[in-house]
Amino acid sequence: MNLHQYAETHQVTNQPPSLDGVNLYRIDLPLQYWSQHFGAGWAQGRIDEYGALAGGPLMAAGFLANENKPQFVSHDRYGHRIDLVEFHPSYHELMRTAIEHGLPSLPWTDPQPGAHVARASMTYLHSQAEAGSGCPLTMTFASVPALRLQPDLAAIWLPKVLATEYDPRNIDISQKAGVTLGMAMTEKQGGTDVRANTTRAYPVGAKGPGQAYELLGHKWFCSAPMSDGFLTLAQTDKGLSCFLLPRHRPDGSRNEFYIQRLKNKLGNSSNASSEVEFRGALAWMIGEEGRGVPTIIEMVAMTRFDCMVGSSALMRQALTQASHHCAHRLVGGRVLAEQPLMQNVLADLALESEAALVLSLRMGRALDNPDDLHEARFSRLVTAVGKYWICKRAPAMINEAAECMGGAGYVEDSILPRLYREAPVNSTWEGSGNVQCLDVLRALSKEPGVLDALFAELGDGHGDRRLAQHIAQLKNAFTDTDDIQYRARQLTEDIALGLQAKLLLEAGNSDVSDAFIGSRLQGSARVYGTLPRGLNVAAIVARSTPQMA
């Protein structure tokens, strides 16, 4: 018997075409619409350009950067302490591309209307390709408001922070055109409670803003430890203060900044997170002594905003993969995406994704208008609301998207496992869920006008009885202050859903807004795929499914 004729056992059929090389912007109708709606129409060309990069070379680099994790090298071969973290070349490609396209700098260097929205849109695309590199990009972007509080230091650092040049060399910033910045706040004993920090700062000479100090202590989490400098917190005689700590001293020698080890994390694998010690590390005070938290808080707010954008991006990429798979997969002789139950699931996932995007880009518009009192109050509240709600929704949503793909969504050849492992970090980083909800209560009770700004934003329901009823119930919830901390999560969720519904209803696709309001403001669904009857789910699925050229 001649078995050679049977060497080819089967033909590969019923598999979706590859998405490799697709322009992530051009297949994303919601992003195209909302980025223009919120003021970034002038930037569509550069967003489109980044969409091609994100779906092509950056997507490929993302797989390599996560397969080849950063490695800590404490000493060189001669025994000298060097404290290096070595990255795969793909990581540097991700960083270089993002910095050259202005992801950490655009709103600061070109502060025209819509700049924050444009930058958030490109960050949204970048994070779909690879999210871990977003950490140093975000911290560099977010450091600018804090640096500006100390003009003498800003004069040295800001031109390099805002430069569109990436230089990963471990050398003093005087020899670099571009730098990145990190942040190190939490300690073993306190975590989020940074006022419990024990790291001490001792003046080298004169005391106060802009002066040099030596820091003695540790930080339990320091992400991107190969950054050129770090904003950090330490205690002085007047309390917790903010400092800029460079990797190198002015004479070019190593600063007393020692990496202890890299964290072995659930996800976020391309990004190095570390434990560090300061053993007399030279640093310069930023802002008023004893006012470290207020000084660094705007940086924290910006990083929380990027958590919203990042989680929205993870959900969008999961939806892209699931909807594309189901659009090209036959089950029982019928296209999976055209079968009623799968349409219910995919439409529900699409609602979650677009609602996350619209709230994130609405926040971007608020950041574009910092001198507008309403926008400033909106930003103060919704940074915490959105960070809580969007980041909280991502893990379950991505899990459901993977399930739509069956085993194909569970194997590491797919991007879904990486998205799923990545999703929890944004809920935890810069304050976990309870921290955000307590911040919502703080903003509403301590800062004048924030509650009024919320209800001014929500309006009267925009002609929709269901939204009007939700707003009325929300108002009643705030008149009852009993056990308000106990109810903080429910209140924050209700604010988020009300804002998402309002934004979708006010300017969005009517099929999407009707389905969102009908499923989120009414009913009590616990899992995806339980949308009520009577909705145009086919149109919602079509809106979210990549259209291949």
Model-derived features with residue positions:
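C-terminal helix-coil-helix/basic helical segment that borders enzyme active sites and/or dimer interfaces
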Residues: E354-K387, A402-E403, K475-A488, T492
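Internal helix-loop-helix
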Residues: H80-D172, S223-A224, E422, W429, ...
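C-terminal amphipathic alpha-helical interaction region
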Residues: E447, A453, E457-A549
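Flexible glycine/proline-rich, aromatic-decorated loop/lid segments
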Residues: L266-I297, C404-V435, L444, L451, ...
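A glycine-rich, basic-preceded beta-loop-alpha segment at the flavin cofactor/substrate interface
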Residues: D251, Q260, E275-T303, T320-A337, ...
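Conserved phosphate/anionic-ligand binding catalytic regions in large, soluble enzymes, centered on
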Residues: E130-P145, M308-S311, M315, K392, ...
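Extended, charge-enriched "interface" segments that sit outside catalytic cores
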Residues: M1-Q112, M548-A549
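A short core secondary-structure module
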Residues: G210-E256
